[in-house]
Amino acid sequence: MNKVNGKKTSFAPIREDGSRITICYGLKKLSGDLYEWLEVYLPKKQTSTLSLQMVKDAIENDINSRVDEKILCSYPWTVLHGDDAGKDVKVWLSKENQSNFKAKYDLHFTKPESLTFPTIYKIAEDDDHNAVFEVFQNFEELEAFYLGGIAYIEQCYQAGWQEKSGIDWTPYEDYFKTEE
């Protein structure tokens, strides 16, 4: 995926140049005659006969990848305790971390007597790649963090679904009509 800025006259839904096919989508006006759009590239070697379904798959896969990336490394959190208290970070929500946070949260409902606080988690890295830790003093803090993460993931999915449903497929359909 590549973000491009240019004049609307430079935008073409599908371009074939050299060894690749460029699929453009998400055209947005920025200001005056300046626009922004996203491009996805398909190697011609792997695409002997381009189809509308291949174009749709490429665009939807690109949107899915951006949603996954946003979930993975963009959950905003302000550290509550410890050396990094007050620092705004982007929490690393890998599948493993999500599972660890969920396990600790669920333990409150299944075996509350086995929960101990304070508990500490590595939640991010700073710009110098040093670990950033959060110290949860009680279940309420852990719950706010965990439920905030769940809400953030849901927001990311909703934005992706909205982006997909907002795509006008007409220019791509027209492209294939002229190719016939």
Per-range role (PLM):
Residues 2-180:
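A preference for well-ordered globular domain cores
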